[in-house]
């Protein structure tokens, strides 16, 4: 059965590739601006649910669809994608030397199964090097990432300690997803 990743995220696509999961990537448009909550957990759950509802429209094709959404929380203050360089700098200042949480809501829908998971990746960060912040802001890479968090490169050397579920921090709970895909395959064969 065909698997569709309903996300434009290159980090999510890379996670699936690294785990040998074949998929087709399609954008699902859901207006996150319509969500009025400022609570990070509620926001990421509602955004993922909204994407899941959009995914249901594609289910006539007898496929498996995976969607996800992530936000960053610093002291329970939500950080989404920065709108400009100034907001990106403010996000990084708040993260500097503090604990960050990447909240990821991952979901799957298929003709035989529906699954939703809300997980948290926590990282305690060291202080950022000011010259590296400037280089990072100039690179523009922050524009692709929620809360400007890039655990795979910019943030990586600053992680003092973290939880073990890195895939959640990168935007998709792949470990749980693999189990759900196996379960879905068993259910389909019944």
Swiss-Prot record:
Keywords assigned by UniProt, alphabetized: Cytoplasm, Hydrolase, Nucleotide metabolism
Cofactor(s) it depends on: a divalent metal cation
GO terms assigned for molecular function: nucleoside triphosphate diphosphatase activity
GO cellular component: cytoplasm
Gene3D superfamilies reported in the protein's UniProt record: 3.90.950.10
Leader sequence segment: none
Keyword Ribonucleoprotein in record: no
Any one GO biological process: nucleotide metabolic process
Keyword Phosphoprotein on entry: no
Role of this protein: Nucleoside triphosphate pyrophosphatase. May have a dual role in cell division arrest and in preventing the incorporation of modified nucleotides into cellular nucleic acids.
Identification of the protein by name: Nucleoside triphosphate pyrophosphatase
């Amino acid at each position: 059965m065909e698997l569709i990743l309903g996300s434009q995220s290159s980090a999510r696509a890379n996670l699936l590739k690294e785990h040998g999961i074949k998929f087709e990537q399609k954008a699902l448009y859901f207006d996150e601006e319509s969500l009025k909550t400022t609570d990070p957990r509620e926001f990421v759950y509602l955004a993922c649910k909204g994407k899941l509802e959009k995914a249901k429209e594609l289910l006539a094709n007898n496929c498996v669809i995976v969607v996800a959404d992530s936000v960053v929380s610093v002291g329970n203050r939500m950080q989404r994608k920065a709108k400009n360089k100034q907001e990106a700098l403010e996000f990084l200042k708040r993260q500097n030397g503090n604990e960050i949480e990447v909240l990821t809501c991952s979901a799957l829908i298929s003709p035989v199964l529906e699954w939703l998971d809300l997980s948290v990746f926590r990282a305690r960060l060291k202080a950022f090097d000011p010259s590296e912040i400037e280089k990072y802001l100039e690179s523009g890479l922050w524009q692709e990432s929620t809360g400007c968090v890039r655990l795979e490169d910019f943030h990586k050397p600053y992680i003092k300690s973290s939880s073990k579920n890195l895939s959640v921090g990168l935007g998709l709970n792949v470990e749980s997803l693999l189990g759900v895909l196996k379960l879905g395959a068993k259910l389909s064969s019944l």
